[in-house]
Amino acid sequence: MIRKNFDVIVIGGGHAGVEATFALAKMNLKVALITIYKDKIGAMPCNPSIGGPAKGIITKEIDALGGVQGYYADKAMIQVKMLNESKGPSVRAIRAQIDKEKYSEIIVKDLLQNENVTIFEDFATDLIVENDQIVGVELEKNKTISSNLVVMTTGTYMNSRILRGSDIEHTGPNGEKTGIGLSKALERLGFELIRLKTGTPPRIYSDSIDFSKVEEEVLDVNGYVFSPRSNVKIDKQIHCYLTYTNEKTHKIIQDNINKSAMYSQLIEGTGPRYCPSVEDKIMKFADKERHQIFFEPETSRQDIMYINGLSTSFPVEVQKQIVKTIPGLENARVKIWGYAIEYDAINPLQLKKSLESKKIKGLFLAGQINGTSGYEEAAAQGLIAGINAGLKFKGEDEIVIQRNHGYIGVLIDDLVTKGTQEPYRMLTSRAEYRLLLRNDNVDIRLAHYGLKAHLISQQDYQKILEKYKKIDEKIEELKTKFVSSKTDFAQKYKIENGISYFQALTRPDIEPSDLIKDFEFLNEMTIQIRLEGYIKKQNNAAAKMERLENLKIPEKIDYSQILNLANEAREKFNKIRPQTIGQASRISGINPADIQMLLFYLDLKKSKHEN
């Protein structure tokens, strides 16, 4: 049966699918959201947290663009802290423990009330394509939904299987449904698939844990939020707990290593480098006497603990032995045993920077299907794919976030330029302009993209511009005001006459609020003042990069026509099809001589065209 045509179809209701759906609905488009389980939209199948190094900044960037992850995380958070607070502003990031049930419930409630969203509790089995243009999606319950725009956000559900030792189940996360239909469809359409793996630890009933044997983590009382729109303040935060592996743990793992699905070569997929299983940590870091294990509550009820650091692919009988060696878990009752999960993804080199497929017009892909790991990375891609699908529907230009404007820009550029052979996780070290990509300036960095995407109002955008105008004016004022050596402030910080307020604020030992009272943007201004020289350097470097980004490469360029271009460069340019000179220059193995040849060829073609 052919159903009513939708403006856009979103396949998958995870973190990427949620962002895409909300963005498209806010752009006033009619969206069909296909999800296997309606009550599990926005579910957190792995860790019950959002944020962390770099990731927390991504969540704030999503919010600055008009996305929803930070807003719902605030509404469901049960604990929040600022990581790396003693370090520089560029590496500080929020991490929040989330009530995973509440998070999903409030998302589902808002989607069900959204008149632009129709939810299909069904399973997508095929993509319908005509003349390299997506035209619809086939569903398991004998329906076809039609649209010229589809956003695929299938997560780890494509051709997935769960492994605990030699015990293999062909299911999705937590024993949920999987299917091979979409994998076959993508292969039929010429996509290169890759096989990836991730894992998850056991979940333990809290009433079986001896908390007297573990360390209670200190709570951060500052009350941070991801989204200023949420108006949230947590009255009472909930503790996490810290313990460690030990000699007994390590011996059991070493003695049984061949029973691990990963070490017995049952797993074909590549696992995440920066989130290794416990057996990987013990085998690769044999010199370490212990590894951290965190007990993290999954909900505000605190009845189930997520055992962070104990991800594993061992069979249940070995997991039982391992769990009993962990202090506090000697008598633990387990709700869910740990497992590894393998799934299909695509090589992301097959995508444009808009996250539209290069092969099939109107088909966008986002999230773990593109080779990433993490809720934050998935949500960021879902938002950009949703925005660009919506802009395509409206006949407007796509948005591409530059590397100096956001971690989201770094993430997508890395994927579509370098590709990945393992689950990609965002790290601060991946961003060459990380001093520009801070928590405190996400609004001014990204609001203009949100405005262009119709997710930020003109009124809200003007407020942001006004904020930074006030900061600039205040900075100029501080340069003309001087500290008197007779004040208590001067005595406290041993300041003599002749120093301006601006110069005083450059000193890291000075508490800004001791000098300036009642300025609402004091934190943002202080960071700007103290990093001024470094920011200027990075802005200059970014400006050079942006000039290369503005040099577009024709979509149908024939690289075989470029004389003196190295064979490796020709092969890589043909495979990746870079959209700009800047992107071409970042491809692995490409050197300055290759770029010079490419520029010379483009100039020659331009001259011939003009003549």
From Swiss-Prot:
SUPFAM superfamilies: FAD/NAD(P)-binding domain. Keywords: Cytoplasm, FAD, Flavoprotein, NAD, tRNA processing. It holds the Pfam family SAM_GIDA_C. It is found in: Cytoplasm. Homodimer. Heterotetramer of two MnmE and two MnmG subunits. NAD-binding protein involved in the addition of a carboxymethylaminomethyl (cmnm) group at the wobble position (U34) of certain tRNAs, forming tRNA-cmnm(5)s(2)U34. Belongs to the MnmG family. This is tRNA uridine 5-carboxymethylaminomethyl modification enzyme MnmG.
